[in-house]
Swiss-Prot record:
It is found in: Secreted, Cell wall. Involved in cell wall beta(1->6) glucan synthesis. Keywords: Cell wall, Cell wall biogenesis/degradation, Glycoprotein, Secreted, Signal. O-glycosylated. Residues 1-21 form the signal peptide. Belongs to the KRE9/KNH1 family. Pfam families: Kre9_KNH, Kre9_KNH1_C. The lineage of its organism: Eukaryota, Fungi, Dikarya, Ascomycota, Saccharomycotina. This is Cell wall synthesis protein KRE9.
Amino acid sequence: MRLQRNSIICALVFLVSFVLGDVNIVSPSSKATFSPSGGTVSVPVEWMDNGAYPSLSKISTFTFSLCTGPNNNIDCVAVLASKITPSELTQDDKVYSYTAEFASTLTGNGQYYIQVFAQVDGQGYTIHYTPRFQLTSMGGVTAYTYSATTEPTPQTSIQTTTTNNAQATTIDSRSFTVPYTKQTGTSRFAPMQMQPNTKVTATTWTRKFATSAVTYYSTFGSLPEQATTITPGWSYTISSGVNYATPASMPSDNGGWYKPSKRLSLSARKINMRKV
């Protein structure tokens, strides 16, 4: 990719992958069983917005697919619904739901899970999977015997870019000015990485942040406290060059050799053991 010098002055790119993202699926529950009624199978999918970026308001469409197989070899049997907009979802307090319906002849009996693909226009996507459930009394030809206890790991691939010709990024830059220890959201923002100075002038150690109390959960929490940390890109450049100086022929001339005896603070002594 070639960037024109005058068209883009500054670019900040954030790429977040393999994190929980925007959705925390709560239904169907693990080991749930569904069977057709009137030739149609209905599987309600419910999830909560866990507060991580992107929020559900940023998602343009959802795609629901029926999948089976091991976590490292996902086999999506069919797309159950595509281009479902957020307005087509049912919302009850903080729980969003969509009922996926399909014909009983679509597939055979077996263990399945539903893939929830959320599209964020111009930025990327998130993928989540429901817990595994059973389909029984199906009329399809192909039955699946594979069984497992966990669903595939969710994935998030979101990219936001800010240029001098674009609108402000959806990530508020002021988020990076809030001290990390005072942030409470599931997506936290770290300060820009800086380069060390050429000299160390400090003579004593100082703590950057004050100490804080530690509390432990006695039961499982309903939502993750923290899903990811976002760090801004550098607003500066580092120049470097090749050292063209001809090295000396001997290591000692280059400072890469020393006499071992000069590094010893104590000398070894020989002790003669007297026979008894």
